[in-house]
Amino acid sequence: MSVAIRKRSWEEHVTHWMGQPFNSDDRNTACHHGLVADSLQASMEKDATLNVDRKEKCVSLPDCCHGSELRDFPGRPMGHLSKDVDENDSHEGEDQFLSLEASTETLVHVSDEDNNADLCLTDDKQVLNTQGQKTSGQHMIQGAGSLEKALPIIQSNQVSSNSWGIAGETELALVKESGERKVTDSISKSLELCNEISLSEIKDAPKVNAVDTLNVKDIAPEKQLLNSAVIAQQRRKPDPPKDENERSTCNVVQNEFLDTPCTNRGLPLLKTDFGSCLLQPPSCPNGMSAENGLEKSGFSQHQNKSPPKVKAEDGMQCLQLKETLATQEPTDNQVRLRKRKEIREDRDRARLDSMVLLIMKLDQLDQDIENALSTSSSPSGTPTNLRRHVPDLESGSESGADTISVNQTRVNLSSDTESTDLPSSTPVANSGTKPKTTAIQGISEKEKAEIEAKEACDWLRATGFPQYAQLYEDFLFPIDISLVKREHDFLDRDAIEALCRRLNTLNKCAVMKLEISPHRKRSDDSDEDEPCAISGKWTFQRDSKRWSRLEEFDVFSPKQDLVPGSPDDSHPKDGPSPGGTLMDLSERQEVSSVRSLSSTGSLPSHAPPSEDAATPRTNSVISVCSSSNLAGNDDSFGSLPSPKELSSFSFSMKGHEKTAKSKTRSLLKRMESLKLKSSHHSKHKAPSKLGLIISGPILQEGMDEEKLKQLNCVEISALNGNRINVPMVRKRSVSNSTQTSSSSSQSETSSAVSTPSPVTRTRSLSACNKRVGMYLEGFDPFNQSTFNNVVEQNFKNRESYPEDTVFYIPEDHKPGTFPKALTNGSFSPSGNNGSVNWRTGSFHGPGHISLRRENSSDSPKELKRRNSSSSMSSRLSIYDNVPGSILYSSSGDLADLENEDIFPELDDILYHVKGMQRIVNQWSEKFSDEGDSDSALDSVSPCPSSPKQIHLDVDNDRTTPSDLDSTGNSLNEPEEPSEIPERRDSGVGASLTRSNRHRLRWHSFQSSHRPSLNSVSLQINCQSVAQMNLLQKYSLLKLTALLEKYTPSNKHGFSWAVPKFMKRIKVPDYKDRSVFGVPLTVNVQRTGQPLPQSIQQAMRYLRNHCLDQVGLFRKSGVKSRIQALRQMNEGAIDCVNYEGQSAYDVADMLKQYFRDLPEPLMTNKLSETFLQIYQYVPKDQRLQAIKAAIMLLPDENREVLQTLLYFLSDVTAAVKENQMTPTNLAVCLAPSLFHLNTLKRENSSPRVMQRKQSLGKPDQKDLNENLAATQGLAHMIAECKKLFQVPEEMSRCRNSYTEQELKPLTLEALGHLGNDDSADYQHFLQDCVDGLFKEVKEKFKGWVSYSTSEQAELSYKKVSEGPPLRLWRSVIEVPAVPEEILKRLLKEQHLWDVDLLDSKVIEILDSQTEIYQYVQNSMAPHPARDYVVLRTWRTNLPKGACALLLTSVDHDRAPVVGVRVNVLLSRYLIEPCGPGKSKLTYMCRVDLRGHMPEWYTKSFGHLCAAEVVKIRDSFSNQNTETKDTKSR
């Protein structure tokens, strides 16, 4: 068997056809292709000389012999005809079309054993030719799937009795001899459109010498066909004849396009298969011709089976048609291309013929392209031909990502059918992403491709890459993957690969010109449009709602000149290299950077220049202030032009440089002035509204002592006379040199640092970089300024107290016990001076403001705080688990007296007391044993065990160190309060589920799981809302990378989205439930905490009394008693007395609570992900994966999971008594937490599938899931301390993460928010008052109402500035006058705030303004929330109204006693609305830390409504009590 091949010169393969347009004589030149080889030699010898001139004029086949018009050859039909498909990637004019052509001049033997190439030419000689046309007014070939147009009507006189049809792969298409001439004429007419067709030539095809191929390199063109034909005929003679069946059967050959790697020059690869024939049109005046794919390379038998690779770009689809040609006895085996006589008439007829099949094929290719994008890659050994890649201006080649695989469909010519349905073939190409297992039936391939692109864009937004999704929607793809990798060099390899897979998909879809609808948020109550990018090199322009680059890479050639004009004016004549595709990405975007002032958009230096005209590019001349938080910034543009508008602009570099520099100077000058104004403070806190901040000098890594001496460097601490070594401190700050200036300045912490208590004096050197018993929000362990403050403060403390202090023990002191009081020579225990009470653990100093914690012994009616203005003494604990920051009071004397060196001889005193050393050593050993079995084997307590740790025996009640709260008070509080206040609400509606006045205080659980100082800033619950948003996106990226790497392709979908709250058509009503079966979100909306109070009390009961019960959670309880406990919980809600209950009953009830949740604790969407992590991910990668999965959980689920895991870790700590290891606990609790093997409930999520009943052997899937759940829960219990920390990789995100902390501002910084240098905080407060009354005057226009179960009005308003937080407003009517309500808000917060722990006035600024600090409790073991606010009130407002305004402020005298909350805005407006009634309007926008934006959207508004209800109820309860008292 033979294949027709014609040799081409090297120049024809690598150059475009640049010939001039042909004259009218050229249009009458035709190409004649012989199709039978027997009499080929004579005809060639006859006509070779006669048709030389004609051959030179031929455009379609430049080197062919046109005189070889073979009409009457009785020879045998040729066995195989080679087919090649080509396309034109460079559209330089309006008259460019797509054509499929093939030449059949040269015959080269191919093995008959290859069944994939068995195509014979029948008597009817049916040949398929497809031609496309693209007119200037209408783009017919626009993209994959964009050609869904009506098919032209096929004229009967053109088709005659023969019609295009479809046959099976092995069917025989029989055409009678009588229709042969008609078919030939019709085909000839359809081929006369070549002057409208242009195709690019094959470029740089490697020459492969395969078996039985003839090397015809040196043969003259005139003798080429003659020599090839003679050799081919000689080789065909010994071929064994085929049997009748084989000769009468046509084997369908499918040429499939597969993804194969591109070369480093970005040229797509093409491999040509054998077995079909496409006739060459006679002439192609306006373009290049498509030659045979085998002209330059021969293929062996195994090579014939490998499908080819074709690059489709700019909407032009490579069409390769599978031709099933029936084989009969040879009769007249020729097809003749006749010369044109009436070209214009024939052209019109040919258009109809060609467009019919073209549209049919393109419609089918829409489906094939999608299939090709979701299948595996081709074999590595596939030989390929290189094709020229010439994208348009908006496209660029990308290494490994700029090829589109197109599946070839099967087309058969039939004489008895007119069907136009084209079956789709199986996809075999790889898109770079793992596909889903099953394809959706009924969806076209185009729609699938668009869905895949849409999912890729959604994934990019969900994982912190919204800038690339925007670029794709702006038609600025393809982009260079290498630059993206360089831009995100802080990511690990797996994350980069996951990102590149999506970008590769979008690159291919961009080449196919697939369009997706612009991104739209899901609903009006969604905050999806909140900008968040992992990379710090991109910034979001809020005014234009677009992303722009903050830094430009040096990837553009400075030598390239800029040519003004539209990108449509001209196109590059040569394909750009892979490195030059980001020019559109950065130049067409509004690039904003002070570093890119003189950068110009250009092609890469290694990209070949255009031959005709330089490529028009727009330089990056628009410098936009990228700080999105600068209010009223004059340096930012109000609106930016679109990329297309921007591309047509022309700029002058000199003018641009001058403008940008002036803007940069003004911006830097403003920032510097703001920094200098706050520099006189003890800490240089940069306002959160600023962008770039220049930090102070930082000691760089590698700066040795010799270098310091040469530079004359002197230790700052030495200048102050400090006696503590600082090299250790400097060593901690080395990593700070890798931080950017922005992050280093933003991470500077408060000067209100704490110091160890006197008991921990011996650990001063090793713990100089620690803080005792405190949560330091925003603490940066890499910051050097923190430790300098510690050093300076310690120096002041030592200087403030004499060295020869003598302490006196009371006369009635009993040896072996702690003294009741200690005094020294300068303090008298009976005077007004300070004293230490060892029994109560307090120190009383004279004349200091009080800051005391609400003890559990205080009854609810004894919540009266001492007024800070009238308190004469400060009660401060000196136990070593006290937050050292509490020791800083509002005046400086007490802080100086109570630092670590107040009692320097305390250790000696304790040592010399009779029997004290022995008892202390015994306590130390005993506590060490308890510490080994405590909840945290790797305890991160800020105060590790030491011989000096206090262990009290008071009133025969055993008080362990873990039962001491942060003030040292005993926390063995009674299980139930001595008096439970009676419910005073209405008893209907939402009041049934409203929390009582009692709120659980579980300080021992909080203190025992308090993180260490080094890990405080890494705790999730200390992160701001912007950091949480960024952390969630990074976690999704990390989880996607790990799952795609290790899990099978059918175990996860293409798209990973951040879990959202599921929207059901019918929302279940939980009004009749209070505990069991109530979602965690509803609990948060009702009480502010995700776990009901009664469930928390059950956990505390088990932890305090039942840890020694053998088989806890394993042994079953009594069902009747469990049911009674359930009913007790449903009725009492908050106060359930578990005293005397069986530990196993309570444990079983706790398991039932988690089992009865509407969805698993891990949520329906992520439960399977948790199981997959422990099924497929390697053990060393599981911790990263599980941390990422936890970050994707909703906030309430994550908080409950943390509480439960910490509680279970305490259970396993007592393993010697209860014999419950983490694995044993996991076996008992995993089915309840993951909802394994449970039937679908009525109110469960649609994802929960009904399990099959276990009739015999359990399902293998269930076994695998149970095993994974057990292993996973055991692992999470053991590693619970590490699961809820920020990944270390986030510290490598440079300023993109640290700059999102958004700390409160100082008073000076608040005054400068209005860009007035002379303004102070009073101007800021006045602006706040004016803004409040502006809202009132406008009647709160623009607020959106929000439904709530509380008896209050609730609405919200979106705020474009600052973090992604809404401004909430709740309104209620209160039975009190405005003055009383204002007093209740200012002085009586404990009457309505059930979570209040502490309150204190830090500083009084004027009669109506003060700095106020208060602490609120959180669900254990989560830390308390610390508020430091600047609050001011107004009483002289019109119509008797009052107002209270609060804003967080950074104050150096406010101790950090919890997670510092950032109150962005808090307003109370009280207006009289009747006799004895007032209308209370509460507006709030607060960052509580540790919550996602979704939590604030779904839950925070309900908390605001609940707050005003509690304020109203405080007056209602007071009135009711007053009436009860009068009635008695």
Swiss-Prot record:
<feature type="compositionally biased region" description="Polar residues">
    <location>
        <begin position="396"/>
        <end position="436"/>
    </location>
</feature>
<feature type="compositionally biased region" description="Low complexity">
    <location>
        <begin position="591"/>
        <end position="605"/>
    </location>
</feature>
<dbReference type="GO" id="GO:0042169">
    <property type="term" value="F:SH2 domain binding"/>
</dbReference>
<feature type="region of interest" description="Polybasic cluster (PBR)">
    <location>
        <begin position="1051"/>
        <end position="1073"/>
    </location>
</feature>
<dbReference type="InterPro" id="IPR001660">
    <property type="entry name" value="SAM"/>
</dbReference>
<dbReference type="GO" id="GO:0030036">
    <property type="term" value="P:actin cytoskeleton organization"/>
</dbReference>
<dbReference type="GO" id="GO:0005901">
    <property type="term" value="C:caveola"/>
</dbReference>
<dbReference type="InterPro" id="IPR023393">
    <property type="entry name" value="START-like_dom_sf"/>
</dbReference>
<feature type="site" description="Arginine finger; crucial for GTP hydrolysis by stabilizing the transition state">
    <location>
        <position position="1114"/>
    </location>
</feature>
<protein>
    <recommendedName>
        <fullName>Rho GTPase-activating protein 7</fullName>
    </recommendedName>
</protein>
<keyword id="KW-0597">Phosphoprotein</keyword>
<dbReference type="GO" id="GO:0005829">
    <property type="term" value="C:cytosol"/>
</dbReference>
<keyword id="KW-0043">Tumor suppressor</keyword>
<feature type="region of interest" description="Disordered">
    <location>
        <begin position="372"/>
        <end position="436"/>
    </location>
</feature>
<dbReference type="GO" id="GO:0003007">
    <property type="term" value="P:heart morphogenesis"/>
</dbReference>
<feature type="region of interest" description="Disordered">
    <location>
        <begin position="72"/>
        <end position="94"/>
    </location>
</feature>
<comment type="subunit">
    <text>Interacts with EF1A1, facilitates EF1A1 distribution to the membrane periphery and ruffles upon growth factor stimulation and suppresses cell migration. Interacts with tensin TNS1 (via N-terminus); the interaction is decreased by phosphorylation of TNS1. Interacts with TNS3 and PTEN; in resting cells, interacts with TNS3 (via C2 tensin-type domain) but, following growth factor stimulation, TNS3 and PTEN are phosphorylated which leads to weakened interaction with TNS3 and enhanced interaction with PTEN.</text>
</comment>
<feature type="modified residue" description="Phosphoserine">
    <location>
        <position position="523"/>
    </location>
</feature>
<feature type="compositionally biased region" description="Basic and acidic residues">
    <location>
        <begin position="851"/>
        <end position="862"/>
    </location>
</feature>
<dbReference type="GO" id="GO:0051895">
    <property type="term" value="P:negative regulation of focal adhesion assembly"/>
</dbReference>
<dbReference type="GO" id="GO:0005783">
    <property type="term" value="C:endoplasmic reticulum"/>
</dbReference>
<dbReference type="GO" id="GO:0005925">
    <property type="term" value="C:focal adhesion"/>
</dbReference>
<dbReference type="GO" id="GO:0051497">
    <property type="term" value="P:negative regulation of stress fiber assembly"/>
</dbReference>
<feature type="compositionally biased region" description="Basic and acidic residues">
    <location>
        <begin position="950"/>
        <end position="960"/>
    </location>
</feature>
<dbReference type="GO" id="GO:0005096">
    <property type="term" value="F:GTPase activator activity"/>
</dbReference>
<feature type="modified residue" description="Phosphoserine">
    <location>
        <position position="526"/>
    </location>
</feature>
<feature type="modified residue" description="Phosphoserine">
    <location>
        <position position="566"/>
    </location>
</feature>
<feature type="modified residue" description="Phosphoserine">
    <location>
        <position position="757"/>
    </location>
</feature>
<dbReference type="GO" id="GO:1900119">
    <property type="term" value="P:positive regulation of execution phase of apoptosis"/>
</dbReference>
<dbReference type="InterPro" id="IPR000198">
    <property type="entry name" value="RhoGAP_dom"/>
</dbReference>
<dbReference type="GO" id="GO:0043231">
    <property type="term" value="C:intracellular membrane-bounded organelle"/>
</dbReference>
<dbReference type="GO" id="GO:0030336">
    <property type="term" value="P:negative regulation of cell migration"/>
</dbReference>
<feature type="compositionally biased region" description="Polar residues">
    <location>
        <begin position="936"/>
        <end position="948"/>
    </location>
</feature>
<dbReference type="Pfam" id="PF00620">
    <property type="entry name" value="RhoGAP"/>
</dbReference>
<dbReference type="GO" id="GO:0035024">
    <property type="term" value="P:negative regulation of Rho protein signal transduction"/>
</dbReference>
<dbReference type="GO" id="GO:0021575">
    <property type="term" value="P:hindbrain morphogenesis"/>
</dbReference>
<feature type="region of interest" description="Focal adhesion-targeting (FAT)">
    <location>
        <begin position="710"/>
        <end position="884"/>
    </location>
</feature>
<feature type="compositionally biased region" description="Low complexity">
    <location>
        <begin position="734"/>
        <end position="760"/>
    </location>
</feature>
<dbReference type="GO" id="GO:0045121">
    <property type="term" value="C:membrane raft"/>
</dbReference>
<comment type="function">
    <text>Functions as a GTPase-activating protein for the small GTPases RHOA, RHOB, RHOC and CDC42, terminating their downstream signaling. This induces morphological changes and detachment through cytoskeletal reorganization, playing a critical role in biological processes such as cell migration and proliferation. Also functions in vivo as an activator of the phospholipase PLCD1. Active DLC1 increases cell migration velocity but reduces directionality.</text>
</comment>
<dbReference type="GO" id="GO:0030864">
    <property type="term" value="C:cortical actin cytoskeleton"/>
</dbReference>
<dbReference type="GO" id="GO:0005634">
    <property type="term" value="C:nucleus"/>
</dbReference>
